[in-house]
């Protein structure tokens, strides 16, 4: 059985330099570059990837689907540039795809914030569905966070994948700004409006209960300061996306027109 590892990326050159040499055991690596300006495409090509270019779509699933379409393997493992597969994955994946009736496999992921593995606060095991038969799964294209849809039974891998999404706070805030903007767009498209009820939900109730659940009930406090940081911004996500929704609605042409001051009558 052939295995294709598919990756999409935008300005991920440092991660690619570290990640790609660890994946030489795959049949092929398909890298889709999304308008990078840091040399990511050239580095991926130098390190042996089959390289393609696509627009940097905010709906990441569109380019994930494109990467799968370019792959030639019977099996696909989708990987983000900031993820790592420990050495034990090579033997485990090669073994399971040679002798299985499953259409896909889940695995656990260890999320690291600023170099710290977060074991609590709903951050682990953070189960992901990543290994699948090419002809038995697809990414929906409606939403950036929609999961892989699989036609068939799903197994479980034994080893944990590593995830290093945030190396520092500045990087976190940049991604936080991006994803809250995307989520605000989905709120708008799904018909959510600025009302008293929604304001109470998004600015008070949702943040309060999210923080309570993840920091206290799920033990996020046991991960120290990184756990507190994660829980606070996880709760603030609701607040920021709702204010961005307000801004989007306010800046529509019809609302801008209604907010424009009437010209004063000439004397």
Where on the chain are the PLM-derived regions?
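Conserved donor nucleotide-binding strand/loop of the catalytic core
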Residues: 41-70
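Short, structured coil segments at secondary-structure junctions
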Residues: 25, 47-48, 127, 150
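A conserved acidic beta->alpha catalytic loop
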Residues: 13, 22, 33-43, 56, ...
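Catalytic-site signature of metal-activated, phosphate-bearing donor transferases
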Residues: 61-68, 75, 86-252, 267
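Compositionally biased, intrinsically disordered low-complexity segments enriched in Pro/Arg/Gln/His
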Residues: 261-265
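Short acidic donor-binding/metal-coordinating loop in glycosyltransferase active sites
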Residues: 34, 56, 73, 80-83, ...
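Short, well-formed alpha-helical segments that are part of the catalytic scaffolds
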Residues: 7-25
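Cell-envelope/extracellular polymer assembly enzymes that use nucleotide-activated donors
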Residues: 2-4
């Amino acid at each position: 059985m052939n295995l294709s590892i598919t990756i999409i990326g935008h300005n991920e050159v440092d991660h690619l330099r570290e990640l790609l040499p660890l994946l030489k055991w795959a049949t092929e690596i398909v890298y889709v570059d999304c308008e990078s300006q840091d040399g990511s495409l050239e580095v991926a090509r130098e390190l042996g990837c089959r390289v393609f270019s696509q627009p940097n779509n905010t709906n990441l699933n569109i380019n994930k689907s494109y990467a799968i379409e370019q792959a030639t393997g019977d099996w696909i493992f989708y990987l983000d540039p900031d993820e790592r597969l420990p050495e034990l994955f090579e033997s485990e994946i090669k073994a399971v795809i040679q002798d299985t009736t499953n259409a896909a496999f889940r695995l656990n992921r260890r999320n690291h914030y600023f170099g710290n593995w977060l074991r609590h606060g709903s951050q682990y095991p953070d189960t992901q569905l990543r290994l699948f038969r090419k002809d038995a799964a697809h990414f929906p294209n409606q939403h950036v966070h929609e999961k892989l849809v699989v036609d068939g039974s799903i197994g479980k891998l034994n080893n944990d994948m590593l995830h290093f999404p945030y190396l520092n706070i500045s990087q976190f805030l940049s991604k936080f700004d991006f994803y809250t903007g995307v989520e605000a767009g989905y709120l708008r498209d799904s018909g959510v409006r600025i009302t008293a009820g929604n304001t109470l939900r998004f600015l008070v109730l949702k943040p309060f209960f999210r923080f309570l659940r993840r920091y206290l009930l799920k033990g996020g406090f046991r991960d120290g300061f990184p756990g507190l940081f994660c829980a606070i911004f996880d709760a603030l996500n609701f607040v920021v996306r709702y204010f961005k929704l307000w801004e989007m609605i306010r800046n529509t042409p019809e609302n801008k027109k209604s907010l424009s001051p009437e010209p004063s009558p000439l004397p």
